[in-house]
Design a protein with these regions (language model features):
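Glycine-rich, anion-gripping cofactor-binding loops and their flanking helix/strand elements
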Residues: 89-177, 288-320, 332-335, 366-367, ...
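Glycine-rich phosphate/diphosphate-binding loops that line cofactor/substrate pockets in enzymes
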Residues: 21-27, 69-85, 105, 146-148, ...
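Glycine-rich, acidic loop regions that bind phosphate or pyrophosphate groups
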Residues: 1-14, 37, 119-228, 408
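Conformationally flexible catalytic loops at phosphate/diphosphate-handling active centers
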Residues: 18, 22-79, 242, 443-445
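Conserved thiamine diphosphate
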Residues: 1-41, 117-120, 146, 156-178, ...
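Active-site diphosphate/adenylate-binding microenvironment
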Residues: 231-308, 313
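Thiamine diphosphate
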Residues: 143, 148, 187-189, 195-197, ...
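Glycine-rich beta-alpha junction loops
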Residues: 35-40, 89-91, 183, 275-277, ...
């Protein structure tokens, strides 16, 4: 978000105060403080920042909510017959209170809700009003509801390309509300009808307060208006778009994530991921009911993120179960950090869905490159059990569905760092998916849908 070059050691205290303030306020983001070596050897006087004067950047926030905007927000809700809440990481960044307020507003309205990858956990994943994740690998019901809605209420999301699909066919008939703390995100990709620059918590508090005062029996009075909408959503749900063909001989990656969820859901579990198919399967099949239990790289999509993230989470929550759901390729990007986990006695669990491929690359090679699997197959993988033992960790391997539960329990009950090598089906692809260059309502639900060729325009958008 900003950077400083320290030229005088006596400026360092003020710069550090500014750096922490700018990094953590508004839309959170990294800052850089460059301290040259000669400055590092100087001594200065530390001054407490009493003025709270912070360097103003583009996108700074007034923190004043316009009541006209709040009233218009509520009026648009009241007029809608096919609404949907579309929520993102901004809800989680706003703090735990924002998630509580979001649940209250969704309950007050009776509207369906979907979430981006980074917003998972802001709303309970097992609630019947939750349609699952939306976007490129989102559910059939979430994506079709986004396409067909007449009111889209975007709270803390940014209309990124993984969500919108073909942007000129994105939700063509809907009115759109966009709430974001960063004004530069509003109107950047999608034109909206009501733009509100605000912290999510503050906006939701204002909306709920006025909504309760003026619409005490909203759900019962509005039920008939949205009945057809919910009927349509239930028809989309009947597609069961996250279903897959299970196997008694081979572990399906979706099954592995489901079993991990079932065996850990009664604990306060923290999940990190690497980047790839395993990341999407985790988002689809592991249900998050609290914020800040899901840490994943969704913007840059950096392979190698999950292991150091798990280390950080374990240090912050030393008595909690922390699992990095990984791919065999991504985990090798930062595998040296296992020594950090060993050195600091951090009992993280690395749960590798090992299909011997960079699976997401392979899936796109099937769609776009006539199955020319260039550089996506890894023949010379290490033995992950022996690799774990070499670091001083515990190695566990599961090859068949029959032994999976027992091995997962062994992993959970081991009070040391664990590398779990879960050998899964090599050919399994991640569905559903929106092909590149297509709108929300043209999804691939399985291999049988892949026959339609991706357009040249779509190929350039991957």
């Amino acid at each position: 978000k900003h950077n400083w070059l320290v030229k005088d050691v006596n400026d360092l205290a003020d710069i550090m105060n500014q750096a922490f303030e700018i990094a953590t306020t508004g839309r959170p983001g990294p800052v850089l403080v460059d301290i040259p070596k000669d400055i590092q050897f100087n001594k200065g006087v530390y001054k407490v920042n009493k003025s709270n004067l912070v360097k103003k950047l583009n996108g700074s926030l007034s923190n004043k909510i316009n009541l006209k905007d709040v009233n218009k927000f509520i009026e648009m809700i009241k007029k809608s017959s096919k609404p949907i809440f579309y929520t993102g990481g901004g809800v989680i960044n706003s703090g735990p209170k924002a998630s509580e307020l979001l649940k209250e507003l969704v309950s007050l309205t009776g509207f369906p809700i979907t979430s981006t990858l980074q917003g998972l956990g802001a709303y309970p994943g097992d609630d019947p009003q939750f349609l699952g994740m939306l976007g490129m690998h989102g559910t059939y019901e979430a994506n079709n509801a986004m396409h067909d809605c007449d009111l889209m209420i975007n709270i803390g999301a940014r209309f990124d390309d993984r969500i919108t699909g073909k942007i000129d066919e994105f939700s063509p008939k809907s009115k759109k509300i966009h709430v974001d703390i960063d004004p530069s995100s509003i109107g950047k990709n999608v034109k909206v009808d009501l733009a509100i620059t605000s912290d999510v918590t503050e906006l939701l508090q204002s909306v709920i307060k006025i909504f309760k005062e003026k619409n005490k029996n909203f759900i019962s009075s509005n039920k008939q208006k949205t009945a057809k909408w919910w009927t349509q959503i239930e028809k989309w749900r009947e597609k069961k778009s996250l279903n897959y063909v299970n196997s008694k001989k081979t572990i399906k990656p979706q099954h592995a994530v489901q079993r991990l969820y079932e065996l850990t859901k009664d604990q306060d579990t923290f999940i990190t991921t690497e980047v790839g198919q395993h990341q999407m399967w985790a988002a689809q099949h592991y249900k998050f009911n609290k914020p800040n239990r899901w840490m994943t790289s969704g913007g840059l999509g950096t392979m190698g993120y999950g292991l150091p993230a798990a280390i950080g989470v374990q240090i912050a929550h030393p008595k909690k179960l922390v699992v990095d759901i990984a791919g065999e390729a991504s985990i090798l990007m930062n595998i040296q950090e296992m020594s950090t986990a060993i050195q600091y006695r951090l009992p993280i669990k690395i749960f590798i869905l090992n299909n011997e491929y960079m699976g997401m690359v392979r899936q796109w090679q099937e769609l776009l490159h006539d199955k020319n699997y260039s550089e996506s197959y890894t023949e010379a993988l290490p033995d992950f059990v022996k690799l774990a033992e070499a670091y001083g960790a515990v190695g566990i391997r599961a090859k068949t569905p029959d032994e999976l539960d027992e091995k997962i329990r062994e992993m959970i009950n081991t009070d040391k760092p664990v590398i779990f090598d879960c050998v899964v089906d090599k050919a399994e692809n991640c569905y559903p998916m929106i092909p590149s260059g297509k709108p929300h309502n043209q999804m691939l639900l399985g291999p049988e849908d892949e026959k339609e060729e991706v357009s040249d325009e779509g190929k350039t958008l991957v």
